[in-house]
Amino acid sequence: MEPLPRAVWLLCSWFGISFRRRKRSNLRRAVELPGKPPFFCRENRAAIEVNIETDLGKVHIINTHLGLGWRERLVQAQLFTSAEWRAAIAGDTPLILLGDFNSLRGSRPYRTLSRHLRDVRELIQATGPIRTFPTRFPVLAVDHIFVNGAVQPLSLTVHRSALARIASDHFPLMAEFALSPHRCPE
């Protein structure tokens, strides 16, 4: 993988999330997410938006890390489904929204997102929960990948390694996707 230019890498890793790429890409924006954090955790939360150029056209990717309080997460999930954010992405542009949502399936933030996007776990018909947290003994599935109709997931796995266990308290999700040539704008 090629690292992002240093200035972009510093910006993108500011709130504990990062983006690295193999293909040509451009950073659309890195934003601090809204919502009042709970008293026990005053961490800033963010989202990084990038466009990746593929042989089939542009793919829009948003990497995020939502807060710990349920009200904070709900406000943040509503941001991603707002008219402003949806209008910024062309209707047929493949979209992947991924990250640490700190939300279980069935929670209000999760339901807010799944009304507009599809959960990769459900699309590949995972036979059991794909647990990512905590790395010491993963019992919760709070990390998710959502896609729109222009993206077809092919696989979803949890990357479990000694290095992943050291790098974070969450194991990373890894997914492969297919894009429909007629749905990818140039």
Regions found by a protein language model. Name each.
Residues 47-54, 58-62, 74-98, 109-110:
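His/acidic metal-ligating clusters that form di-metal
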Residues 66-68, 103:
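Short, glycine/acidic-enriched loop or turn micro-motifs at the edges of active sites
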Residues 10-12, 47-51, 63, 144-145, ...:
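Conserved hydrophobic/aromatic beta-strand scaffold that supports enzyme active sites
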Residues 17, 84-96, 102-186:
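Metal-dependent phosphoester-hydrolase catalytic domains
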Residues 1-2, 57, 78-82, 178-186:
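N-terminal, active-site-proximal structural segment of metallo-dependent hydrolase catalytic domains
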Residues 40, 70-71, 136:
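Acidic-and-aromatic substrate-binding clefts and catalytic sites of carbohydrate-active enzymes
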Residues 1-58, 157:
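Structured beta-strand-rich core segments of catalytic domains in phosphoester-bond hydrolases
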Residues 4, 70-72, 165-167:
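Solvent-exposed loop/turn segments connecting transmembrane beta-strands
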